[in-house]
Each structure stands twice: as structure tokens, then as C-alpha cells.
């Protein structure tokens, strides 16, 4: 098999001397050449340790006769940019990470790639990039943080912050992050690590391993070795591995873990790079009868490290195995079914249980695997975790994580309280200007409006209020943190800046939410119910007076993103 790197050496005589100038030896030049791309940087705990894993990957590559070249494009942290204009860059950064992988991989010849990241935009950016360049590739998840004292995890800080603003707690509760890794709850970072493994692009049993575990170093080294192997095999490119069946497997795992709603932005965008169409309807259809099994925060009891101690993605897949496509290929060169059988016999689950016992000792508790990942016949829920709502308010759809929503809010009629920015809305919530029975709207926060930031602080201010958390809804064309809980509906499409119906909502409109029937409608005006025909006529009149907003960003990457971003329900990827 002729390697791309060796063919390019013949075409570009300056390539060899330039590489020797960066530390390659003449012997290295003739080896399998692997790009090792990470989001390493001092940007946040999820990326700060990846340089250590990169060196383990390179060691594994060398052990199998290859040479690994280090590249990186660090990611930003949604947590660090929350509540500032910095959060507007978050979703756009996913596209930039994918773009840099394309540039790095195609500007210089490589035979394979290993990609390392941990967090919200790094993981989907890596997966989009590896799909686009389509060289044999292995993804290495960066793992999760350990929980802190009293089992505190980072998603609780939004709630604590709202309580602090209301004078309910002191400042001491607000400051903590223990170690490297993704935040220790099933937010977007954890969800996307799990999705990478569920798609077959990461080695089995690697998602959400504690970042402090020495086993993570071993897996990184093995990923390097595997990259060299698949570089020399036929039909082991990402496009040979990932199919529609792979995505269906991932979505069923997403249902079982009650994954982040942001996955409805990321999986469709990744699928788009593979030439596969995934829509909100795909999620909704598969979630409707899927088992929800994982009792991990934010919807459950335990920190995310417990997911790995209970057996991780393989343990989830074992429980839902009869619904999965077990014949899909994976980066091991074996099918999913073969991988699951091998893990039963190689001591993987015994090692996980050993870690669980250490966790129990740390907190003086007695948690079992079944407490964390419920057996299939004792599922937490039988209708998945995500619903896509539609109606005259969201013709293209809107997303709710119903497993994190109080059941009394599943069928509601509420009064509309529209705001044209999150700042206005958050101020109203904190000053008690939002009342029981309100449907709070935050609009002009979609991809084209402002980059589609998270409405995390507003959602936490609502859900941490004992009365508001069970009596009002938050509806937006923006998105929510994977840590968000409560009656929150995002991705409302079309977005306001495109003239979607959310832009036409007025104070006092009656809003119908029906989760089980998948409805989101305006059903009344000024507190009075109207027929759907009357509502349509009134909205048509309002549209005549609606004026498109001038584009918010005049230059830079957010100008580019807001000009070309697709609809939230398509994945908000760049459409050129």
C-alpha cells in the first residue's frame, strides 16, 4: 500500500529538509506519518493536560513504527465566557477548529490522524474536521474531572451563583475546580465524548475516563499504535466507518444518558461532513421509545466520573444492545458487536468496578453499578430524554430536554413575556419582575442573531427559584448549557433574525406547551384564546410591521458565522 506521505515527498523536495529542521530524523521521514492534533492550551481544565496525552499518543505511534507530528488549535471554555459577550464566540469556534484541522491535514501530507479534546466545541470540532479530511483517524477523549468535597461538581455553581445574588449563601460556596478534565456532569462536553465513542471513532471504553487515571495514558498510547495500523489498512477511513447506522446507535446512547440538547447541533453538523442528513426528527423518532438509564447529574444523582466506574459507553450499549446496529465498523477494525464481546473477556468491567470501590471509599458511601446505570427493565424513563416541539411558534422545531423538566410543566398554557436579549431577561428574573405562569422569551440569540450563545445564567436563575422553576418556561432561539435544568426550550426555528414567529410574539400572548404531543403554539392574544385561523391572521398582520434587524457584527469571525450559519435545527454549521 502506497502511503500519501511518501508520494508527496517525491513531489515536494523542500518537505524533507523542512521537517528535519523541526526535529525529524532521516529515518522518521520514511515512516507512517501521523498528525496528532489536540486542543491543548491553558484555556481551561479540559484542555490543560492534553499535552501529556499527546506525548503518550506519539509514544504509541513510535512503538508501531510511525512518527507523530504535534499540531494544536485550542478551544475556549463556555464556563469561562458565560454571562459575557465571549459566549457568542462559542459555537463559531467549533467551525474554526474543524477548519484548522482541514488546513493542517491538507497543507502537509499525513497518512493518519489522532485527535484529542475533552470539551463542548473541541470534540465536535475535531469530529467534523476528521470527517472532512477523511484520513484514517482515531479520537482520544480527554476524560472528566473528579468531583470535589461533598461531591460538588461544576454545574452546581450556576445555581449557587443565583442563590448568592439573592443573598441566600455566602461567597465560599462559589470557588472550586479540582483537576483537569471535562466538567463532571452529563453536559455537552461529556455528551460529545460519549458520542465519539458511540460513533465508533474512539477506542472502546475511553469516553469520560477520569482525567487523573493512569489508564487514560495507556489508552492514549494504544490510540497512537492503532492509528499506525489503520493507516496501512484498506477501507479504514472515517467515511468507511461512520454510517447512518452509526448515528442511530449514537442517538440511542444519547437517549440512554439523557445527553445535552447541544448534541442536536453537533451530531447533525458532524453528519453533514460525512454527507449524511440527521435532523431533529431523527432524534425525536429514536428517543420516543428509548430507555433512559443513566442516573448522573445534572438530571441524576452522581458525578460523571461514576459513568466510567459503572462501565461507561460499553455498559450502556450492553443494556440497549437489542436496539443497536452491532455490525457497524469501528476504529478497532472490528465491529461494535465484536468490541462488546471482547470487553467482557479482557478485564475491562472488573477494572471499572475497582475504581467504583475507590470512589465509595473516598466519600464513605456504597454506590453500585446499577445505581448509576440502571438495568434496561428498571429504566428511569421509557421515552428517551429529548423532544422536538413544533407549531406556529416553531415551524421548523424547538428542543426540550424533558427529563430535566418538571412533569407539571409538560402541558401548560402560559403568558408571553418577550425580551430581545438575555441581559434584559436575566435582570427581570433576578429583580422578581417575572411571575408564576409566564413564558419568558429570549430572542435574537440564534446563530445569525448573535452566534447562538447559551442562556445558562437565566435558566439557572429560574430553575434555582423554587416557585419559578415549576411554574414558568424559558423559550429561545438561542441554546442552553448541558448543565441546564428546568422548563427550558431552545433552538426555536426559524430564529428571530430570519423573521421566525418567535420575533412576532407580544406581551400577553397565550403560549401552549405540550411535550407529549410535541406542540409549541401561540393560542391566544392579550390573554384571550383565539382560533388557529385567527392567530394566523394576527401573526400575518404583525409580520407586515416587523422589520429585519441590521446585522449585529460588522467584521471578524462572528460576521462570517452570522452570515453563513445554517438553521439551529440543521446544526448551525457554516453553509458556504
Segments (PLM) and residue ranges:
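Glycine-/small-residue-enriched capping loops at alpha/beta junctions
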Residues: 49
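Glycine-rich, highly charged phosphate/nucleotide-binding loops
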Residues: 90-99
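A short, small-residue-rich loop immediately preceding and capping a beta-strand
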Residues: 105-126, 139-141
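Catalytic or ion-coupling anion/metal-binding cores of large enzyme and transporter domains
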Residues: 1-46, 55-73, 79, 85-90, ...
